Amino acid sequence: MSRPYEEILNGGTLPRSAPGDRHETICARLHREMAVSIAGLTGVQLLAPRTQVQIARATAFCPDLALVMAATGKLFLAAEIISRDDHRADTVTKKEIYEQHRVPRLWMVDPRYDNVEIYHSFEFGLKLHGILAGNEILQEKLVPQFKITMKELFA
């Protein structure tokens, strides 16, 4: 069973509710597919769900899925599964921090609507690259083996 946890935002704590069963099922599916997809890739490392990742000197988040560069530990891709109970922390607060620190890829996974918003970093912040739902496929060209349909992810 999941437990509540805390993230660090500008030196203060950001308490988070324990993820629910559906949240954890979606997280497990993402991790399973990503683990298979990066097998043999030496440049990236998949962290365990909600491993604390340093974003800035006084800010550390616990993404549901985090891919970091193996050589530097720098966050490359973060996936946040939005919780109905405290969605503002993910959809506003953390997204702004990810944007400020130019995290290259951000997936906002929304079980409320069974969709995923994909953001790519560019020189002015994060840009919405697409919103996927239904039979559409979540994929990342920098991890070419990773592919999962929205129906599979949210089943």
Residue spans for each PLM region:
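Gly/Pro/Ser/Thr-rich low-complexity, intrinsically disordered segments predominantly at protein N-termini
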Residues: M1-A155
